[in-house]
């Protein structure tokens, strides 16, 4: 079980990312666009640099939905590998079967 503070901090980061996502996308488009002038590009880079660090999506950590475990996360289930194994053995994951070949 992860510390509650780490889970809350990650949730706060998700909210910050969502709040700044649209403006970040606009600024990045200006920076990437060959049609933007060097002044526009510099202004966009400056504004992007002055946004909070946590506004970047790469700072959000994928965590287990049940206990917040940060490692071994499987996106398909939103759970850690440990939790997937436990739930699969208990038959609580629909469509998941133990491999046999």
Swiss-Prot record:
One record GO biological process: translation
One Gene Ontology term of the molecular function aspect: structural constituent of ribosome
Compositional bias (Polar residues): 34-45
Region named Disordered: 29-60
Keyword rRNA-binding set for record: yes
InterPro entries documented for this protein: Ribosomal_uS14, Ribosomal_uS14_bac/plastid
Coiled-coil ranges per UniProt: none
Keywords, in A-Z order: Ribonucleoprotein, Ribosomal protein, RNA-binding, rRNA-binding
GO CC list: small ribosomal subunit
Function: Binds 16S rRNA, required for the assembly of 30S particles and may also be responsible for determining the conformation of the 16S rRNA at the A site.
Family note: Belongs to the universal ribosomal protein uS14 family.
Subunit structure: Part of the 30S ribosomal subunit. Contacts proteins S3 and S10.
Protein name in UniProt: Small ribosomal subunit protein uS14A
Provenance organism: Mycolicibacterium paratuberculosis (strain ATCC BAA-968 / K-10) (Mycobacterium paratuberculosis)
Upper taxonomic lineage: Bacteria, Bacillati, Actinomycetota, Actinomycetes, Mycobacteriales
